[in-house]
Amino acid sequence: ARNGIYKIIYVAPERLMTSGFLSVGAAQTVSMVCVDEAHCVSQWGQDFRPSYLAIPDYIKTLSHRPVVGAFTATATGEVREDILRLLQLQAPKVLVTGFDRPNLYFGVLSPTDKYAAVRQYLLSHPDRSGIIYCLTRKTVEEVTELLCEDGFSAVRYHAGLDPEERRRNQDDFVYDRARIMVATNAFGMGIDKSNVSFVLHYNMPKNIESYYQEAGRAGRDGEPADCILLYSGRDVITNQFLIDQSEPNPDLSPEQQAEIRQRDKERLRQMTFYATAHSCLREFLLRYF
């Protein structure tokens, strides 16, 4: 990298301000910095990462200011304002495309037996490939085991698996050797599999941003696809517990942490409104963003 043989370097923001990486920037002319998942810079974003706040500091260490681009698939107006301000973008051109994807069908079910509902759906769509998102690793393990026992071609993915199994299972799904991926939200970043024709949420996510981002992995080939949430009141309790038990961020003050926790609870409330809505779900999502 220091010798300039790479045209593109992918790097986690956590590494930007390390001495090793700073020397790379000092040795080369950087023509452009692209920030993916830019919503992570905002405390109001669904995946706030303090390391994103250091990106402007890194840019200032370069010999000249490069073109800076920031991209995200899910950002409310409030988060978009934060992206402009916190990344210190200069005279930016802001492009916001429509959030509506007409080929996606959105539905919510409240079955007494979630696995039975999933099994019935898969039997009714025998040739379709898709993702089943679960809230916890334990649920991923349970659902994958049941699917395999019932003869479905399913693999699992969560942060508790060793990297080699995660890579193997991801490849099996992406290259159509496995029909179904059962995963936590650890799966999906950077995955662009065009023929995902359904995304089932076995549990309700903690916010609408995460739900829409995960559901949006369906139908990227433009063909009709299903995005179905299996909702139960227990999902709300589990999410509330996860919010309350989330590890404190040492980079934030106690006041900031309390504010973020309160924000997360409000987002969970909005997600619950979606899951229990009696109106058009597509309209609900478009209104939210």
Regions found by a protein language model. Give the residues of each.
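C-terminal accessory/connector segments of nucleic-acid motor ATPases
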Residues: 247-289
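Helicase motor core with emphasis on the C-terminal RecA-like subdomain
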Residues: 1-256, 266
